[in-house]
Amino acid sequence: HIHRYSIVTAGVRLSKAEIDVIAKAFKKIKDEVGIASCGSLGLLDFDDFVKLKESGMARYHCNIETSPNYFKSICTTHSMEDKDATIKAAKKAGLQICSGCIIGMGESVEDRVDIALHLRDLKVDSTPINILNPIAGTPLEHQSPLTQEEIERTIAVFRHILPKVVLRLAGGRLKIQSFY
């Protein structure tokens, strides 16, 4: 049976009117269904998070995507500082934090260690680890797929640096031979 429901939006930032609509949806889910709610709603501020928490949202998802040093190579619409501010505001509002990354986007081994260290410093509760699946016609189409050893070493490093965090093998997990 279903334990949790998540509302996910596209784009960088929602308007206050959109936040109000989503808050009403979370309240209805809490009052009528009684399951936990999560949100992945882009870059929000503390007041937005307080409203959403009061309406029933328990966990916020905001991936950092990659290391602070490599972030500008991947994202042009906002900064790592924007992500950090969002995560810290959600945490301050009392929400659980789910934040992770995509590995295999051209980052170095050192970048992967920095991702885990950064997530540790942000005190996240769960971390999805996604593995890039290069797709033709996209900016990362020519990235070489990670080897099994690179994937497994990365997961091991994350487990070592984040011993109490729930690691979620997410997008691309079927690339992990030991997964199935």
List each language-model region with its residue ranges.
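Conserved, mostly hydrophobic/aromatic
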Residues: 7, 62, 90, 119, ...
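Catalytic cores of alpha/beta
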Residues: 44-54, 105-120, 174-180
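Alpha-helix N-cap and loop-to-helix initiation/capping positions
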Residues: 17, 21, 75-82, 107-114, ...
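Hydrophobic positions in alpha-helices of CheY-like receiver
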Residues: 25-29, 90, 158, 162
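Auxiliary Fe-S-binding modules of radical SAM enzymes
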Residues: 120-180
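Core AdoMet radical
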Residues: 1-87, 96-103, 125-130
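Short, flexible active-site loops
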Residues: 96-104, 112, 133-143
